[in-house]
């Protein structure tokens, strides 16, 4: 197998801890996973193209969950912090996610992600598409 073939395969940054989990992976931005994920969330082709043009290798956080009775204990902070470290080690230049504002949460998830340095660059199905440049 050639090195180029290895780098085209997604690298998992998924993790599960007691009380929560995060699902994500790192891919080259010209691979179909980025387009497929953002399209399925309702992102415009302009948003997708701008990400692909800015970053060659990108991490995608598809899903994060913290058990309701464990929220407020730092589990989400640890999951995102570990995902940022894993993405950086895997060569990602940025992390992209769609902040789920439709979910019933006691906190503003968009502001919470902004606390890590994520910035909104567009929307997908009415939810913010957020990017953290590494």
Where are these regions (language model features)?
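Conserved catalytic-core motifs of GNAT/GCN5-like acyltransferases
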Residues: 98-99, 110, 114-131
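Conserved acyl-donor/pantetheine-binding loop and adjacent beta-alpha core of acyl/acetyltransferases
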Residues: 16-60
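Residue-level recognition of the GNAT/N-acetyltransferase active site
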Residues: 62, 67, 100
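Conserved short alpha-helix immediately C-terminal to the canonical SAM/SAH-binding motif I
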Residues: 79, 105, 109
